Amino acid sequence: MLAMASGAERRLAVMPLPRQVNWRGRSGRFYALMPERLDSFQLVGEDLFLLARGTLPVWVGSAFDVINDAQSRARFRLALEAADRAFAVDVEADEVTRMTVVWDLEGAEPVNGLSAA
């Protein structure tokens, strides 16, 4: 006998994630973030991610940060418990730019009414 998926599970499987969403950093800069499934996203290398609970960023960083920085690792563990969404952040590879983006996104908020191209 085949198990039937609940209505909510079927809706989740059918509904694709939005293409990109806009967030405004504390500096006023806009970022087009790519939504990821929280239950299946993977920290890989120096790829940057933002974990949020609603409209509040709870952690911004990469696998490199989790591995090499005890404070970031502790914040990441707490963020996994609290977060209800994850976003991939497209950022340049140089360290200064990456650190600046992390700082900026830690105080970011989603922007309604703008469409990311």
Cite the ranges covered by each PLM segment:
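GIY-YIG nuclease catalytic motif and its immediate N-terminal context
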Residues: 1-76, 82, 95-106, 117
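Canonical phosphoinositide-binding patch of PH/PH-like domains
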Residues: 87-92
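Conserved "boundary/linchpin" sites in short secondary-structure elements
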Residues: 110-112
